[in-house]
């Protein structure tokens, strides 16, 4: 019988996978994985050489050099073509050699788990061949890439494709891409019928101004949850032990309590200015109670550059340090050639970063937080005020990003407190900061007021939050919230803060900070912060967008304001003393803005992670220069309840000398390049 090309490739792949081999090393479950690699190609109809240059030796060299716990390799990208020979879906026409078969064979021989990268909601080929599967726009036109969650696409094509790959290649799991972040409102007939049945509203809303807009987005979110539940359950049934996730679900992109049986959580950071995104995403994922990792792109693009460039290893190490310090796993994404080749330069960089991470794995992976400063994260605000079902949220997330950056720049160890978790976890934190969210809701307001009444220290930012809690706090306000631009001052100058402000009608004795209508401190002072006793605790109310202002454009003047508000509430547990003897005291630079402190614990020991973020791009307009300046010796103090038995610098294993006095261990860190851990024994 003569075989056609697809049947020949499928038969060849089966033969490759069926070769008798020695007993394979056991592969780690995802919960035990710490470092991984990701490769995707998004095959298209224009590919002619898929798999041509891929060899067992190349894959083996990569695995032996980098020693990842898992690899994620492409099987379907957003165009919709499969990268392997398939009897279920449409394979890319240019498959010369079955890459997935080679990756499975070699990873299995090395005890490395293999996951496939698989595009879910986004499938351009599916909607081209089946227009009835396409998501419908408000203009009545079918989408060119996005499938409809109300269509037969998932059952008829997506799940069978996933099951075929899982079985034929004995995959350990899937990383489903193009999912929650790709979902936009669907105006198909099925959505219209469902919406009318649930709300009684006959016309689907087009904008937030239309009746039923929030209900419409909530319906889309629920439809997505049902879609994810179906493919997760199907794969768990088809291949028991299969581990699967939906990219970015249950992160800040979908900030809700995890209820679906995803086996792990994961997301790929933006290629530009990724460290800043890593700070907030790592802190959010660490709260969700599931194994998690974050992925750095190993390269960066941008029209402003007119070219693509690999990231230097030190930039990836800074991004990795931010992730692993929160207890998570880490992976790096690179793109092979269309023919499957991975150059040794990519291998060397990945190997360097992997070695950096492995040295820190013992005291990083699956550690637990020591609560210090908690930033309240309002998923409700994002779901109620954004114009899409899920993130990325862009500037709408500035309140949280700004608060995290601001607190880190002042030396605090910072966690996020998701609103769905606040009632059960907020009491652990000696300091809680509520950014200037617009719609935290009455349930959150009650939780926050109760936290302060029980003795908590709370910084409440934003006009809307001040108004919402004014009754509970017995806070007098003067007038409604209005748009203003005020000038905030410290000893060095002024910073403008524009946005929604509300007047404070408190007694002068409660005012702790003022702003000005012009850059002139002689007149027109406007109270912008007040200290309010509440029960056993203290609430500092800042009546404007302090967190968002810092998130949109950090400045040391806003740090000065924040110190004025926060230091009396709770001082950081770790403080640094600059060692610049040639400078006058008033000219000595701040150390905190470039040093991140993360307090963790593991195996009964206190862990102080120190991350040097010098040189990290904070905007996509600039690239990392590949140099991270060392700090030199750092005098530091760590507040501890008892004198420690030992303080060891990891990963060097160097025991540090120091003294314990007045509740603080004081010592000298010889030097800090990118990341180090003070492992403190016997101080709990």
Model-derived segments and spans:
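N-terminal secretory signal peptides
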Residues: 1-3
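N-terminal structural segment of carbohydrate-active enzymes
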Residues: 25-80
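Aromatic- and glycine-enriched glycan-recognition loops and surfaces
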Residues: 47-66, 87-110, 226, 397-398, ...
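Active-site-adjacent "subsite" loops/lids of carbohydrate-active enzymes
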Residues: 116-169, 206-214
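Active-site neighborhood of glycoside hydrolase catalytic domains
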Residues: 154-252
């Amino acid at each position: 019988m003569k075989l056609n090309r697809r049947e020949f490739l499928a038969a060849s792949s089966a033969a490759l996978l069926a070769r008798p081999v020695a007993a394979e090393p056991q592969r780690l479950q995802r919960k035990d994985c710490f470092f991984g690699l990701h490769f995707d190609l998004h095959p298209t109809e224009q590919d002619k050489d898929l798999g041509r240059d891929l060899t067992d030796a190349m894959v083996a060299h990569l695995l032996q050099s980098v020693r990842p716990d898992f690899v994620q390799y492409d099987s379907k990208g957003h165009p919709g073509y499969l990268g392997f020979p398939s009897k279920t879906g449409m394979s890319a026409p240019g498959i010369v050699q079955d890459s997935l078969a080679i990756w499975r064979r070699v990873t299995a021989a090395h005890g490395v788990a293999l996951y496939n990268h698989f595009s879910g909601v986004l499938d351009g080929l599916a909607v081209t061949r089946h227009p009835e599967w396409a998501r419908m726009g408000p203009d009545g036109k079918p989408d060119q890439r996005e499938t409809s969650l109300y269509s037969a696409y998932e059952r008829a094509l997506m799940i069978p494709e996933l099951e075929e790959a899982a079985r034929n290649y004995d995959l350990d799991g899937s990383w489903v891409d193009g999912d929650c972040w790709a979902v936009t409102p669907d105006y198909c007939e099925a959505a219209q019928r469902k919406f009318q049945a649930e709300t009684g509203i006959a016309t689907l809303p087009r904008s937030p101004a239309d009746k039923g807009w929030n209900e419409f987005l909530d319906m889309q979110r629920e439809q997505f949850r049902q879609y994810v539940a179906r493919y997760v359950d199907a794969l768990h049934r088809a291949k028991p032990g299969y581990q699967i996730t939906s990219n970015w679900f249950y992160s800040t992109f979908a900030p809700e309590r995890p209820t679906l049986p995803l086996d792990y959580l994961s997301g790929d950071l933006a290629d530009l200015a990724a460290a800043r995104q890593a700070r907030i995403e790592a802190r959010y994922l660490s709260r969700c109670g599931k194994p998690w990792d974050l992925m750095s792109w190993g390269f960066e693009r941008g029209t402003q550059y007119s070219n693509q460039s690999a990231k230097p290893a030190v930039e990836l190490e800074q991004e990795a340090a931010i992730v692993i310090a929160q207890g998570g796993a880490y992976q790096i994404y690179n793109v092979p050639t269309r023919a499957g080749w991975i150059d040794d330069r990519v291998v060397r960089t990945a190997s360097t970063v992997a070695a950096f991470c492995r040295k820190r794995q013992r005291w990083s992976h699956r550690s637990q937080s020591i609560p210090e400063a908690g930033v309240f994260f309002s998923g409700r605000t994002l779901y109620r005020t954004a114009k899409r079902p899920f993130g990325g949220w862009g500037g709408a997330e500035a309140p949280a990003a700004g608060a995290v950056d601001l607190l880190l720049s002042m030396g605090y160890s910072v966690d996020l407190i998701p609103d769905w978790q606040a009632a059960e976890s907020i009491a652990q934190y000696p300091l809680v900061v509520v950014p200037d969210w617009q719609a935290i809701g009455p349930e959150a307001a009650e939780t926050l007021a109760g936290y302060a009444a029980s003795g908590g220290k709370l910084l409440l930012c934003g006009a809307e939050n001040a108004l919402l809690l004014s009754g509970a706090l017995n806070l007098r306000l003067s007038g409604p919230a209005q748009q203003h631009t005020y000038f905030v001052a410290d000893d060095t100058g002024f910073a403008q803060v524009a946005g929604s402000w509300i007047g404070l009608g408190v007694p002068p004795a409660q005012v702790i900070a003022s702003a000005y209508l012009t850059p002139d401190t002689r007149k027109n002072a406007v109270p912008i912060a007040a200290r309010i006793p509440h029960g056993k605790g203290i609430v500092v109310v800042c009546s404007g967008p302090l967190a968002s202002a810092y998130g949109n454009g950090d400045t040391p003047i806003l740090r000065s304001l924040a110190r004025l508000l926060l230091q009396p509430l709770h001082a950081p547990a770790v403080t640094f003393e600059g060692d610049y003897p040639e400078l006058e005291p008033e000219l000595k630079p701040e150390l905190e803005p470039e040093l991140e402190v993360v307090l963790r614990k593991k195996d009964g020991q206190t862990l102080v992670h120190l991350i040097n973020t010098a040189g990290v791009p904070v905007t996509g307009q600039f690239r990392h220069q590949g140099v991270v300046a060392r700090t030199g010796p750092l005098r530091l103090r760590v507040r501890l309840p008892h004198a420690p038995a030992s303080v060891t610098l990891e990963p060097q294993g160097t025991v540090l000398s120091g003294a314990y006095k007045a509740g603080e261990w004081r010592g000298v860190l010889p030097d800090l390049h990118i990341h180090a851990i003070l492992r403190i024994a016997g101080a709990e």
